[in-house]
């Protein structure tokens, strides 16, 4: 590892520990030339994943877009900021494990819906309403029916 001060490539590791919930290794190093101490992080390199959009175009997977969409769905629910981050990390891990290089945006959307359905029903309905482009109350009712198995009469009395 190159020293940030003198650019010497000889250093010794003073301390190593797991970081980022086991996803990286933090190493404290000392330059053998100038004795400058610095920290490095070692992570597994992941292959970039391309997302194939509905119109056929592709773009690189963007974790921030995933976070933004899920955060909006989880506003004013019991999801904490930390829980949202962990949820997004889990979705990202599944995407990176399941796909070789390309994944359809529809597959990502369904993966998010499947996971949200288990975690929080309100966030699930909110995400589904945007992802599936609900046009009116009927779309909400049919999704609520599938979520709870309730009859239309029961839902009508609630609404």
UniProtKB/Swiss-Prot annotation:
- Name of the protein: Transcriptional repressor NrdR
Task: Tell me which cofactor or cofactors this protein depends on.
Answer: Zn(2+)
Cofactor remark from the record:
Binds 1 zinc ion.
PROSITE patterns to which the protein is assigned, alphabetical: ATP_CONE
One Pfam family it belongs to: Zn_ribbon_NrdR
* Entry annotated with the keyword Magnesium: no
Q: List, alphabetically, the InterPro entries matched.
A: ATP-cone_dom, NrdR-like_N, RNR_NrdR-like
Species: Prochlorococcus marinus (strain MIT 9312)
Q: Which UniProt keywords apply?
A: ATP-binding, DNA-binding, Metal-binding, Nucleotide-binding, Repressor, Transcription, Transcription regulation, Zinc, Zinc-finger
List compositional bias (Polar residues) regions by residue number. 1-11
An individual GO BP term: negative regulation of DNA-templated transcription
Q: Report unnamed zinc finger ranges.
A: 3-34
Q: Where are the residues of the annotated region Disordered?
A: 1-21
Report the sequence similarity comment from the record: Belongs to the NrdR family.
Q: Which PANTHER family match?
A: TRANSCRIPTIONAL REPRESSOR NRDR
Enumerate the HAMAP family for this protein. Answer: NrdR (MF_00440)
Q: ATP-cone domain: which residues?
A: 49-139
What does this protein do, in the record's words? Answer: Negatively regulates transcription of bacterial ribonucleotide reductase nrd genes and operons by binding to NrdR-boxes.
Q: Which GO terms describe its molecular function?
A: ATP binding; DNA binding; zinc ion binding
């Amino acid at each position: 590892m190159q020293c940030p001060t003198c650019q010497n490539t000889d250093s010794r590791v003073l301390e190593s520990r797991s970081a980022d919930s086991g996803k990286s290794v933090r190493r404290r190093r000392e330059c053998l030339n100038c004795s400058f101490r610095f920290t490095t992080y070692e992570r597994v390199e992941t292959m970039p994943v391309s997302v194939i959009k509905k119109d056929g175009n592709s773009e690189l997977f963007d974790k921030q877009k995933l976070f933004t969409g899920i955060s909006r769905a989880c506003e004013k629910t019991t999801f904490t900021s930390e829980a949202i981050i962990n949820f997004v990390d889990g979705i990202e891990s599944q995407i990176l494990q399941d796909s070789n290089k390309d994944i359809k945006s529809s597959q990502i959307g369904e993966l998010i819906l499947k996971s949200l359905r288990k975690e929080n029903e309100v966030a699930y309905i909110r995400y589904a309403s945007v992802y599936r482009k609900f046009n009116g109350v009927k779309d909400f009712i049919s999704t609520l029916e599938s979520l709870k198995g309730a009859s239309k009469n029961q839902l009508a009395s609630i609404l």
